[in-house]
Regions:
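Conserved small/polar residues in nucleotide/adenosyl-binding loops
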Residues: 321-327
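Conserved active-site segment immediately N-terminal to the catalytic lysine
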Residues: 203-215
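Active-site C-terminal subdomain of aminotransferase-like
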Residues: 39-40, 215-304
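Conserved beta-loop-alpha segment that forms the PLP phosphate-binding cup at the N-terminus of a helix
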Residues: 80-108, 112, 116-120
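Active-site phosphate-binding strand-loop segment of PLP-dependent enzymes
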Residues: 140-196, 209, 217
Length: 331
């Protein structure tokens, strides 16, 4: 029997066609001035390079709680379901929809740039009845425009982008959450480019679902997608007729790992969470008011310099330009 197994499992010749002799990686140090990824603090980079520990190690479990609490601070929320998705911001975007959209739900997407279109595409893939209200790229929505669309379409969810990466527009949020409560729908907010960079108040604005990324305003390399879900969205998820149609992003399962039970779901990207913890710690150490002011000061300096080169704002009003992404057009 042993001899037969040895014969059956005998080694085949190794195909060496793809065995290439590459040099060790040697990326240069660059100052990153695009919309993301952004430069990471040396403390964050050092944390990423630490020796991994197990994803159920008591030390890691403690760190998970610290990351959650610091995310609540950054978002200004008390939401219990606040955690970093294992994936980039697009994974967190999909998580907000996968957990709350049921087939036939009307999802109204306020589109004012590329990432509003992505929200609409994703919602449709979860068999939502997608409706859109659109503004020319570089403009933002008024409360009257949004309320008219809510009255017309009667959605289960209004989804919109806070700071639209593709245009630089930062949507004014005062009153939108109240409109959603008035018309009995959830408010889903993309904060990918705004978290850590501009004033952002999830609870005060009555936002029910939000997501972000690690590599922009938080100054951590890409790899995690912060996610937060409020009580109204949690209630909708709990009332689903069937399972969340995405096992990996199912918050009801993830909460068993990130919540008090600490039940294994998947192998978490341990070192990415090391980096996220340090990036969030540095943000809390600086303070949100100071961080927002720093971004504002740097943005105004950049705007002034670009104007001196003969460039003009793509967004017509400076007050609605996203501070960490000043988009310009040549005149």
């Amino acid at each position: 029997m042993i001899r037969a197994l040895a014969t059956t499992n005998s080694l085949l010749p190794v195909d060496d066609r793809h065995r290439k002799a590459f040099a060790p990686i040697g990326t240069p140090d660059r100052l990153l001035l695009g919309p993301g990824p952004s430069n990471a603090h040396p403390t964050v980079l050092k944390a990423l390079s630490r020796t991994p520990i197990g994803h159920l190690d008591p030390l890691y479990v403690e760190l998970m709680g610290e990351v959650q609490e610091l995310l609540r601070y950054a978002w200004q929320t008390d939401n219990r379901l606040t955690l970093p998705m294992s994936g980039t911001g697009s994974a967190a975007m999909e998580a907000t929809l996968a957990n709350t959209v049921e087939p036939g739900d009307t999802v109204l997407v306020a589109v004012k740039g590329y990432f509003g279109l992505r929200l609409a595409d994703m919602a449709g893939r979860y068999r939502a009845e997608v409706k859109t209200i659109e503004k020319p790229w570089g403009e933002w929505f008024s409360l009257d425009e949004l309320e008219a669309a809510l009255i017309e379409h009667k959605p289960a969810i209004l989804a919109m982008v806070h700071a639209e990466t593709s245009t630089g527009v930062c949507q004014p949020m005062d009153g939108i959450g109240d409109l959603c409560r008035k018309h009995d729908c959830l408010l889903l907010l993309d904060t990918v480019t705004s978290l850590g960079g501009v004033p952002l108040y999830i609870d005060e604005w009555k936002v029910d679902l939000a997501y972000s990324c690690s590599q922009k305003g938080l100054s951590c390399p890409p790899g995690l997608g912060p996610f937060t879900m409020g009580p109204r969205a949690e209630a909708k998820m709990s009332a689903r007729q069937g399972k969340v149609p995405n096992w990996y992003l199912d918050v009801s399962l993830l909460n068993q790992y990130w919540g008090s039970d600490r039940v294994y779901h998947h192998t978490a990207p341990v070192n990415m969470n090391f980096g996220m913890r340090e990036a969030l710690r540095l943000l809390a150490e600086e303070g949100l008011d100071q961080a927002w002011a720093r971004h504002r000061s740097n943005a105004e300096l950049l705007w002034s310099g670009l104007e001196s080169l003969g460039l003009s704002m793509h967004v017509p009003a400076v007050s609605y330009t996203h501070l960490t992404l000043p988009t310009r057009a040549v005149v």
